[in-house]
A protein has these predicted regions:
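Mid-domain catalytic core of redox enzymes
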Residues: 47-164
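Short glycine/threonine-rich loop-to-helix capping motif typified by GTGT followed
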Residues: 51-55, 86, 183-185, 217-230
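Helical element adjacent to the flavin cofactor pocket in flavoenzyme catalytic cores
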Residues: 5-58
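Active-site-proximal substrate-binding core of FAD-dependent oxidoreductases
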Residues: 50-51, 285-288
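Hydrophobic, well-ordered secondary-structure elements that form the walls
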Residues: 72, 111, 172, 198, ...
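A conserved FAD-binding loop/helix module that cradles the flavin
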Residues: 262-285
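A glycine-rich dinucleotide-binding beta-alpha-beta segment and adjacent secondary-structure elements
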Residues: 145-153, 204-266
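C-terminal segments that line or cap access tunnels to active or ligand-binding sites in enzymes
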Residues: 114-222
C-alpha cells in the first residue's frame, strides 16, 4: 500500500521538472549552501575517516586533511563503512553487506540526435508483453535481459535549453542486475539491441541520427560513486529493508558520524534522498 501511494503521486498528482535537468536540483542546493557560508572542496576523494582529538580527521590524499566536529557521509553506505573506517568503528561486517538485497543497476544510453522524436513524450515506458522474464533476470538469475523493459526520457520535449535547435536530447534506461560484467563488447551489443528495440516498438529510428552518445552502466556506478556491486539505487525496498530495518542515520559505532542518502530512511530516489538529508540534519542539531 505504501508504494502504491508513490504511483498515485507520479501518475495522478504529477511531478516537477527542474529547468536545465536534474543537475539543477544539486546546483540550487549548492548555491543556497554557499550563500549560507558552506565551502565546497571538489576533486578531494576521501580516503580515511578516524577519530582525532575529540572530533574527526578526514584524509583526502591532498595536502591538507580536514578536521571536523562531526562527519556526514552521503557516499555509498557500504563503501564508507568497509573502506573508510577502521574495523572497530564499523557497524556492519562484510557478511552483512553481502547478504543484503540490492536494487537494480542500469544500462543508460544518453543520446543527442538530429530532428524530433515524435511520437515520444517526455516520459515513455516500453514494456514487453511479458516482463516477468526481465525481472527474473534482475533478481533471480542475474544476466543481461534479452527482451528488456525500459524507460525513455526526452527532456527536450519540455525544456528547450537542453538541446540545440533541430535536435533532441534523450536517454534510455534499462534496469539490470547489479554486479553484471559490462565489458565494452557487451555494451556495444546491448546498445544496438536497445536502439533496434526502440525502432521496432515506438517507430522512432535513432540509429543513423546520433550526434552525441554516452553510456553509463555498472562500471561507472562502481568507479564514479563507489557503489556496492554497481547498484544504481542502493538497498532494495524489501519488507526487511524498509523503514527501521534500513541502516541508521546515526552511527552506532562512532559518535559524531552520520549517514544520509539512499541506503537510509526513507529510501531510494531523489525526493527520498532529499528527505533523508533533512532527517540527518535534524539528528546532527539534536545531538549538538
Amino acid at each position: 500500500a505504501l508504494y502504491n501511494l508513490m504511483s498515485h503521486v507520479d501518475f495522478n498528482l504529477g511531478v516537477y521538472y527542474p529547468e536545465g535537468g536534474m543537475s539543477g536540483v544539486a546546483d540550487g542546493i549548492a548555491e543556497l549552501a554557499e550563500e549560507l557560508g558552506v565551502e565546497f572542496r571538489t576533486n578531494h576523494p576521501v580516503e580515511w575517516i578516524h577519530g582525532y582529538r575529540g572530533g574527526f580527521k578526514v584524509e583526502t590524499g591532498g595536502e591538507t586533511d580536514v578536521l571536523a566536529d562531526v562527519v556526514v557521509s552521503d557516499a555509498d553506505y557500504a563503501h564508507t563503512e568497509q573502506e573508510l573506517l577502521p574495523p572497530e568503528k564499523r557497524q556492519y561486517d562484510a557478511d552483512y553487506w553481502e547478504s543484503r538485497t540490492y536494487a537494480p543497476s542500469a544500462f543508460l544510453l544518453y543520446l543527442g540526435v538530429e530532428g524530433d522524436v515524435e511520437p515520444l513524450a517526455h516520459h515513455t515506458l516500453v514494456l514487453p508483453s511479458d516482463w516477468e522474464d526481465h525481472f527474473g533476470q534482475i533478481f533471480d538469475d542475474p544476466e543481461w535481459p534479452d527482451d528488456p523493459a525500459y524507460y525513455l526520457c526526452v527532456p527536450s520535449k519540455t525544456d528547450d535549453s537542453v538541446a540545440p535547435d533541430g535536435h533532441s536530447n534523450l536517454f534510455a534506461l534499462v534496469p539490470i542486475a547489479p554486479g553484471l560484467d559490462d565489458t565494452p563488447e557487451v555494451r556495444d551489443e546491448y546498445r544496438d539491441l536497445v536502439l533496434d528495440d526502440i525502432a521496432q516498438n515506438t517507430g522512432v529510428d535513432l540509429r543513423d541520427r546520433v550526434v552525441v552518445e554516452e553510456r553509463f552502466s555498472v562500471s561507472e556506478f562502481t568507479e564514479r560513486y563507489n557503489s556496492y556491486r554497481g547498484t544504481a539505487l542502493g538497498l532494495a525496498h524489501t519488507l526487511r529493508q524498509t523503514s527501521l530495518f534500513r541502516p541508521p542515520h546515526r552511527s552506532d559505532a562512532l559518535d559524531g558520524l552520520y549517514f544520509t542518502g539512499a541506503f537510509t530512511t526513507p529510501g531510494i530516489g531523489v525526493p527520498m534522498c532529499l528527505i533523508s538529508g533533512e532527517i540527518t540534519a535534524d539528528s546532527v542539531l539534536e545531538d549538538a
